[in-house]
Structure formats: structure tokens, C-alpha cells
Curated annotation (Swiss-Prot):
The lineage of its organism: Eukaryota, Viridiplantae, Streptophyta, Embryophyta, Tracheophyta. This is Chlorophyll a-b binding protein 2.4, chloroplastic. Disruption phenotype: In plants silenced with microRNAs, functional LHCII thylakoid protein complexes where LHCB2 is replaced by LHCB1. However these LHCII complexes are impaired in light state transitions, leading to stunted growth in high light. Belongs to the light-harvesting chlorophyll a/b-binding (LHC) protein family. Residues 1-38 form a transit peptide.
Amino acid sequence: MATSAIQHSSFAGQTTLKPSNDLLRKIGASNGGGRIIMRRTVKSTPQSIWYGPDRPKYLGPFSENTPSYLTGEYPGDYGWDTAGLSADPETFAKNRELEVIHSRWAMLGALGCTFPEILSKNGVKFGEAVWFKAGSQIFSEGGLDYLGNPNLIHAQSILAIWACQVVLMGFIEGYRIGGGPLGEGLDPLYPGGAFDPLNLAEDPEAFSELKVKELKNGRLAMFSMFGFFVQAIVTGKGPIENLFDHIADPVANNAWAYATNFVPGK
């Protein structure tokens, strides 16, 4: 399903406005010492190959006519919605928002699933580096030490972890959906300001490209997370160890070999 971001001309939480030199005018001394009047313009349509009717489609030149509601207005729109899940405008807007949020979580999750294993294989000591085994350490006698260091976070209660998760995530989601601390109308997907310390949204054209890149990498990360779950069930190993096993013996360690020999519960 081709879903995407919630907006098309609003950048970094509020409309990105780029004053050009010819839009600055100084009124003479007759206006009390002079004052600056700034008129700002907005580019509503990104000038990019990823937008508009001529954007790349999901099957390239073999793509059929795309649905009328997929116009290329939003990033990540490849014209694919075979099931018509986004035909309703409200559903379409909701799906775009859900995809962006889940993409970001998946990218963080994929990093969290692989990075501890990489560090562990390079000599960094963890209590448990495999992502789906790490959480169970909280049930051990000594509890769970983050990064294997008891001086960081020493967790011993699953209920306390659950409560903190609910409270913190509820607060963050409320902040996001509410448009900021005072309902300031910040964009729920691209709030900008303190959330854009590198000023990546300063240039509207560059930002429109970054939105596409975010979704492309996010979709890949969601598929990766699905693969990590399947690997955990089938092999009982983490993604990095599975990768090393495959490199060492590609014939014996691949999806087809495991699929033909997999017996649930063994």
C-alpha cells in the first residue's frame, strides 16, 4: 500500500517560508525610522522526480493505471493500493501517519536488534546481546542491567517497566498528537524546532527528498523487523549470528533449507 506523510507543503512543523532578497523592503524615515516588511512565499509542489504524475511507479513502465486518489502529492507514493485501503481520504491520512510512525520505530528497532550483537562480537560485554533474549534477563536473580552495567539502569520488576512504558509513551504520543505542549499546532509528523537540530528542513526541496528517503528506509526496516521475528522463531538466533552462519555455509543456512526442515516447537 502506498502510504506516506501527512502533508505536502508544511515543513518542520509549520510552513517553511523562504524569504528572498527581493521580498525585503525597507520603508523610509517617514515611517518612523524605517521598518522592515517581509513577504514570504511558499512552494506548494516539490520539484522532484518522486512527486507528481510522472513519478516512479511500483512496476515501472509495466504499472497499470494508478488509483485516482494516488496523485503523487505525498512522499512514498508509488501508485500501489490494489486493495483500495486508502480510497477514503480520512483513512488515507491515517494510514500515511501510521506508516511514518511505524517506519521510525522499525528503523530504531532494527538498529537495536543488530548493534548489540555487533558490539558483543567485537569484545564489548553484555549480559545478553541477542535482542529477543535480552528482555528475559529481568526475570533472572540479579535482574537486568542495561549494557551489562549495574550503575546505569538496574531493572528488577517487569511491572515497573510496563508502567513506565505506558506513562512515558502516553505522554509522548499525547504531546505529538496535541501539537506540542500548549496545543501550538505543531505538525504531528514533522514538528521541527528542537526536533530538527540539524535544520534538515530548512530547504523545502531537500526536505521533500528526505521525506521520501525516510519512508523508503522505513519500509525496508519494517520488512527487516519481520525477518528478525521469523529468524528468532525458526533458528533461535540473532540476525548477526544468522548472517555469519549463512556466510560460512550458504547452502545449509538459508531460508529454503530452514523452511523445509522447520518443525514448530523443536
